[in-house]
Amino acid sequence: MAKGILGTKLGMTQIFNESGEVVPVTVVSVEGNVVLQLKTMEVDGYEAVQLGFGDIKEGRQNKPQKGHAAKASATPKRFIKEIRTSVTDFEIGQEIKADTFAAGEMVDVTGTSKGKGFAGAIKRHNQSRGPMAHGSRYHRRPGSMGPVAPNRVFKGKLLPGRMGGEQVTVQNLEIVKVDVERGLLLVKGAIPGARKSQVVVKTAVKGN
């Protein structure tokens, strides 16, 4: 069965495994996940669990948010996502904890990549640069815009522009350790996003 939990990326560190090897890990805080709503086949046409994470300041809460959260006896949440899974094991208002996952499980982590601002074609699309010699008039430019005949540049041309700030999913990461008391997941390797950014940890589609 697919599982999922919402969390905050706290940063990276390293731990030693049983064989004494250093393992780089990302620490994800998952404390405070609450089931806000259950989507069922009869009502919605599909099954999913709606999770809420991270409280909204009282002065910024509106009536729809308060009413939706009140059905789960919870406070309004900043971060709300649906996890497509069977709803039989869940109840509205139930708290989802770090022990949803166990050490050794493979997960997919989705987050928003760091924004890099306006970037050129070389940095943004990993293109090669031209010769840097004095006679060359082509160094870090995008190159040909395409044939003359269409009288336009085709959509999808790899050009400079805003880089980063996009939804990114890293697949098949191993959960190295689960700290239930502190509500932490230690995921092997790097995950998308800056520190304190929101992430979704779900059962790996291709793993396990």
Curated annotation (Swiss-Prot):
One of its GO terms (cellular component) is cytosolic large ribosomal subunit. One of its GO terms (biological process) is translation. GO terms for molecular function: rRNA binding; structural constituent of ribosome. It comes from the Bacteria. PROSITE patterns: RIBOSOMAL_L3. Keywords: Ribonucleoprotein, Ribosomal protein, RNA-binding, rRNA-binding. Residues 126-150 are annotated as: Disordered. PANTHER family: 50S RIBOSOMAL PROTEIN L3 (PTHR11229), LARGE RIBOSOMAL SUBUNIT PROTEIN UL3C (PTHR11229:SF16). One of the primary rRNA binding proteins, it binds directly near the 3'-end of the 23S rRNA, where it nucleates assembly of the 50S subunit. Belongs to the universal ribosomal protein uL3 family. Part of the 50S ribosomal subunit. Forms a cluster with proteins L14 and L19. This is Large ribosomal subunit protein uL3. It comes from Exiguobacterium sibiricum (strain DSM 17290 / CCUG 55495 / CIP 109462 / JCM 13490 / 255-15).
